[in-house]
Design a protein with these regions (language model features):
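Radical SAM/AdoMet-radical enzyme domain recognition
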Residues: 116-133, 142-252
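Conserved alpha-helical substructure of the radical SAM core
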Residues: 17-32, 36, 48-164, 168-178
Length: 253
């Protein structure tokens, strides 16, 4: 229930070419939520459902049942498809849109031992984790950054990702070259929101156009696998979706 958050029964219905979830709470009555605006697409994605793969190890116990518990409890029927490791709270930007509230002075860097423990836990849970993403804050400013990557690559992780705003990659070519040494099965998950200064100022608090261009130029030169990651805000930069996709398709990396 959107009012009391009680777990209630629901059903999926097709109506006016859209897909809705109808819910009824004994206390707060009926509610209706749009979950897809394309019925054929909704039907098609259900073809990609696959049997669950449970984790090898659980980390918490079940107290209240889903969705009220937090953590990898025995109620989980699916393993971690992608695990995010937040190695630091700190960042070299102060983005107004940041859900973590990161900044140059907020929080702390996790110690290398803490991070190793986090990575070891993932391996215990998964044996061979599919994807692990090194994130933050801004992970490239961590004083033990390359030691973190070295340790992660020593583990049976199938694919490693680096979530970054690209500032370090743009400003330090030798740093970027060193990243290339972690390929294959290594990817840059690069923040890229807009081509417009006004949008970047609102989302990131800085004009990062030249930084982004230089970062992509360096990554193209190295042919280092890169995914552009867009924070979309309705009415602000959603008109740029097509332009960003076209730009991405033109890049070597």
């Amino acid at each position: 229930c959107p009012e009391c958050l009680r777990r209630i029964d629901a059903k999926i219905v097709f109506e006016n070419d859209k897909v809705y979830m109808l819910k009824r709470c004994p206390e707060h009555g009926k509610s209706k939520v749009l979950i897809a605006d394309d019925i054929p697409y909704y039907k098609n994605i259900r073809n990609y459902n696959k049997p669950s793969e449970t984790p090898y190890k659980f980390n918490t116990k079940t107290d209240y049942g889903c969705p009220y518990d937090c953590g990898l409890c025995p109620d989980h029927e699916q393993h971690s498809c992608l695990t995010v490791i937040e190695v630091t709270d700190r960042c070299n930007l102060t983005c107004p849109t940041c859900y973590a509230g990161s900044s140059p002075t907020y929080g702390r860097h996790r110690t290398l031992d803490e991070i190793k423990t986090m990575l070891d836990t993932i391996v215990l849970n998964e044996k061979e984790p599919d994807v692990v993403q090194i994130s933050g804050g801004e992970p490239t400013i961590h004083p033990d950054f390359f030691a973190i990557l070295d340790y992660a690559k020593s583990l049976p992780i199938r694919h490693l990702m680096l979530n970054t705003n690209g500032i370090k990659i743009a400003k330090d070519k030798e740093f970027a070259k060193k990243l290339k040494g972690y390929a294959p099965d290594f990817e840059i998950y690069l923040q890229f929101d807009s081509f417009e200064n006004s949008v970047l100022q609102e989302l990131r608090g800085a004009d990062l156009n030249e930084i982004r261009k230089q970062a992509i130029e360096n990554l193209n030169e190295l042919n280092l696998s890169t995914t552009l990651v867009v924070t979309l805000q309705k009415g602000l930069n959603d008109h740029e979706i097509g332009k960003i996709i076209e730009f991405a398709l033109q890049q070597k990396c």
